[in-house]
Amino acid sequence: MTINDNDILSTAKADPDKGFRLIMDKYGEAVYWHIRRLVSAHADAQDATQETFVRLFRTMDKYRGDCSLTSWVYRIATNEALRLIGRRKESDVRLDTRAPEVCRLAADGYVDYTDLEAVKLQEAILALPTRQQLAFNLRYYDELAYDDIACIIGSTAAAAKANYHLAKEKIIEYMNSND
């Protein structure tokens, strides 16, 4: 039985600890994989996931209902991932011309390098501008509606749809290249 978001919210108001556990149970794995696709490395994804749920716990009483609970959770997760990426970019000094996320992908022991197409797909996604990357991941992997994506990335549904389609075109072009 899956518990719906309204039940989670009413439980959280009556018993914040229990409500928080319900949110973790429902969204924990999805949040980890959403963050993982953005930051690439397993350890970074674990850290950002933990920070996401700490932030959720601290701010549960501030949820206004402007967007769905799913969108709110993903927005906080996205912000944590982007915060981590921003901190990392400030400290990165590279001689390698590839994006730092691609370099981390290559160093991650949790990635299956025998599936070259999957690795190439991840490289293509990591090379996208942030909004396109977010729109693509949220639509393709998480199967969210454009309205939810818009709430998460702070845009309109039309802009989210445009970002997704631009990302898809760039990924197809990258996948068809000989690189």
For the regions a protein language model found, what residue spans apply to each?
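DNA-recognition helix of helix-turn-helix
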Residues: L82, A124, Q132, L138-Y141, ...
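Structural recognition of an alpha-helix C-terminal capping motif at a helix-to-coil junction
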Residues: W33, D47-V54, C67-N79
